[in-house]
Amino acid sequence: MKIILAQGNPGSEYARTRHNIGWQCLDALACACGAQFATKPKLHAATASATIAGQPVLLAKPTTFYNDTGRAARAIMDFYKVSLNDVLVIHDELALAFGIIRVRHSGSDAGNNGIKSLNGHLGQGYARLRIGIHSPLRRRMGDAAFVLKPLSQAEQEALGTAIIPATTALVEQFVAGTLNDTSQRVYTTPV
């Protein structure tokens, strides 16, 4: 079984924020697979079972806040007895321009507290889909305010027309075992 875990914050006030872009991608993937999320308190997550590329997959959205994602990931891995090679994390990336998606199979947290939590609980050997959210607005607001601000209308449209399809294709590659660090995608133009 593969685990696809998206970082984000629980609560409707965060639903369309930059920090929840991973959740938005996972919600779209679940919808396309006909999967429904159910809260699993012992796993600290909402999970949904799906079949992708002919394989069983667990989609997971931690119900902890973004900066405590590692606790949920560890609980899920222990419960399902999966290795780090079976885990893909989808998250926003401040260092990449909006719409750029890059694959990484290990690495430091680069100041991302959610990744820091994951690395603390899991180590660094899991795959990551890093979805760029950077825009000039970041410089005026500061990082903390920027990641908690909703996507603009143009960004939300790009998410639906380009980022979600690209993310879905990369998830399918991960499940099929063909995802690698050169599977980088650039699907949108800056908005």
Predicted regions and their residues:
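Electrostatically charged, flexible surface regions
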Residues: 154
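Hydrophobic alpha-helical segments within soluble ligand-binding/sensing domains
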Residues: 111-114
